[in-house]
From Swiss-Prot:
Its main location: cytoplasm. It is found in: Cytoplasm. One of its GO terms (cellular component) is cytosol. This is Ribosomal RNA small subunit methyltransferase G. Specifically methylates the N7 position of a guanine in 16S rRNA. GO terms for molecular function: rRNA (guanine-N7-)-methyltransferase activity. Its EC number is 2.1.1.-. It is an enzyme of class 2 (transferase). S-adenosyl-L-methionine binds at G78, F83, A129, E130, R148. Keywords: Cytoplasm, Methyltransferase, rRNA processing, S-adenosyl-L-methionine, Transferase. Gene3D superfamilies: Vaccinia Virus protein VP39. It comes from Clostridium beijerinckii (strain ATCC 51743 / NCIMB 8052) (Clostridium acetobutylicum). Belongs to the methyltransferase superfamily. RNA methyltransferase RsmG family. Pfam families: GidB.
């Protein structure tokens, strides 16, 4: 229970309670992350405490936004090793969470974690984000699309907003400096049916980490031509 108090306080800060059972799931997740990371590149963060703070607590802090507390469905686009989607799913067993990633090895890792911790509310999809968004079973089918992927807001919006229902939200976990990104992505977000609602600052206890949650409301349907084909999105972002 070495990190229970730290994680419990972080959960309380965003209005949640961390049970001992949930904590044990996080520890199992961490052990599998470290074990698999020796075989495939999942994360550069391998120290126990660093994983707790920079992956688990960072993901849990998303609950500072009430959207994560009331949603029925969520997709994590380009989830990688499962952040933030899987920690969110552990904290809310009643939330249907979909983890989407383009690399089959990462999806295999996620399936192993899901089976180990008994996360029956989580499903995985092996697909590129731009391909998945064309699937009628996925397109405009989620209350929330989220991503912690390393891409600018214009690119992320094109990849994520098509998954969101009208009335839902795209919430990006971004670094400390987002002002210029937001200015440059405002028109792209508008074209894709979104509107920037708020930027919410996140602090991680006992670290110098400062992150931002960029909240985009889906107010209209995304045009059928988006997202565009692979490669074009990052090479030629919507201006």
């Amino acid at each position: 229970m070495k990190f229970y108090d730290l994680m419990s306080k972080s959960a309380e800060d965003v209005g949640l309670q961390l049970s001992k059972e949930q904590y044990e799931k996080f520890i199992d997740y961490m052990k599998l992350l470290q074990e698999w990371n020796e075989k495939i590149n999942l994360t550069a963060i391998i120290d126990d405490e660093e994983i707790i703070k920079k992956h688990f607590i960072d993901s849990i802090k998303a609950f500072k936004r009430d959207e994560f507390k009331i949603a029925s469905s969520l997709i994590d686009v380009g989830t990688g090793a499962g952040f933030p989607g899987l920690p969110i799913a552990i904290m809310r067993a009643d939330l249907n969470v979909t983890l989407l990633d383009s690399l089959n090895k990462r999806v295999s890792f996620l399936n192993t974690v899901i089976n180990r911790i008994g996360a029956s509310n989580v499903t995985t999809i092996h697909s590129r984000a731009e391909d998945g968004a064309k699937d009628i079973k996925l397109r405009e089918n989620f209350d929330i699309a989220t991503s912690r992927a390393v891409a600018n807001m214009s690119v992320l919006s094109e990849l994520c907003l098509p998954y969101v229902k009208v009335g839902g939200s795209f919430i990006a976990l971004k670094g400390p400096s987002v002002d210029q990104e937001i200015i440059e992505s405002t028109n792209a977000i508008k074209i894709l049916g979104g509107k920037i609602l708020e930027v919410c600052e996140i602090n991680i206890e006992d670290t110098e980490l400062k992150h931002n949650l960029v909240v985009v409301k889906k107010i209209d349907r995304s045009p059928k031509g988006y997202p565009r084909r692979a490669g074009l999105i990052s090479k030629n972002p919507i201006k």
